Amino acid sequence: MDLLPSRYKIHKTKLRWILTMMTMMMMMVMRRGESMRLDMESGNTKCISDDIKTNYMTVGTYSIVNPNEGHHLPPSHKLFVTVSSPKGKSHHHAENVESGKFVFTAEETGDYMTCFVAPGYRPTAKFAVDFEWKSGVEAKDWTTIAKRGQITMLEVEVRKLLDVTETIHEEMFQLIEREREMQELNRSTNSRMAALSLLSFVVTMSVAGLQLRHLKSFLERKKLL
């Protein structure tokens, strides 16, 4: 009679262990979202950059911290927000807002810039902004995916691990490509340095030859040779 409960406990323990191990693996290899609080002042600008890979999804949310909960924010607590790509393409633009969200897929690899501008106000106002920026696997809404697909949390964790594995695979190829580019750059640099060294040697020997010729002519005129 006790076999079934015992097996159930063993299965439940194994399941917890598997979930724990999966969670630890994801914490080690998955790109974490950046959550921060920015201190703003009227007339000031603060920018944050994030290195995002091509085809990575990125999600950002921001909101001004209300110093008096239950009351409206004062008129001085407003933001101008812009998000731009490494080449300057705008992915988000908002004016005179208290909160907002941006979602896009990176079209190129590089540093994406998010800038917060607090408009000028008199008297000067100070306030805080909560900002969370997620990219890659971390940016996906796994709770919504689980609800839509009607799948278990174990299946969600497995899908996360698959996405993490694919991400690592892509980054490995990118690292290999960068290494190849660096090797080509090194070869090109070495070739140029060799050519420059040869040119310097030729110029030096030519100048030395001219000096010897001039010295010989001078000594002959003085009848020292």
UniProtKB/Swiss-Prot annotation:
One of its GO terms (biological process) is protein transport. A motif (COPII vesicle coat-binding) lies at residues 218-219. It comes from the Eukaryota. The chain crosses the membrane at residues 194-210. The keyword Cell inner membrane does not apply. Glycans are attached at residue 186. A motif (COPI vesicle coat-binding) lies at residues 218-225. Keywords: Coiled coil, Endoplasmic reticulum, ER-Golgi transport, Glycoprotein, Golgi apparatus, Membrane, Methylation, Protein transport, Signal, Transmembrane, Transmembrane helix, Transport. It is found in: Endoplasmic reticulum membrane; Golgi apparatus, cis-Golgi network membrane; Golgi apparatus, Golgi stack membrane. Residues 175-188 form a coiled coil. Residues 36-193 are lumenal. Residues 1-35 form the signal peptide. InterPro entries: Emp24-like, GOLD_dom. The modification Omega-N-methylated arginine is found at residue 178. Residues 45-160 form the GOLD domain. The keyword Signal applies. Residues 211-225 are cytoplasmic. Pfam families: EMP24_GP25L. Belongs to the EMP24/GP25L family. Probably oligomerizes with other members of the EMP24/GP25L family. Associates with the COPI vesicle coat (coatomer). Associates with the COPII vesicle coat (coatomer). PANTHER family: TRANSMEMBRANE EMP24 DOMAIN-CONTAINING PROTEIN. Involved in vesicular protein trafficking. Mainly functions in the early secretory pathway. Thought to act as cargo receptor at the lumenal side for incorporation of secretory cargo molecules into transport vesicles and to be involved in vesicle coat formation at the cytoplasmic side. This is Transmembrane emp24 domain-containing protein p24delta11. It comes from Arabidopsis thaliana (Mouse-ear cress).
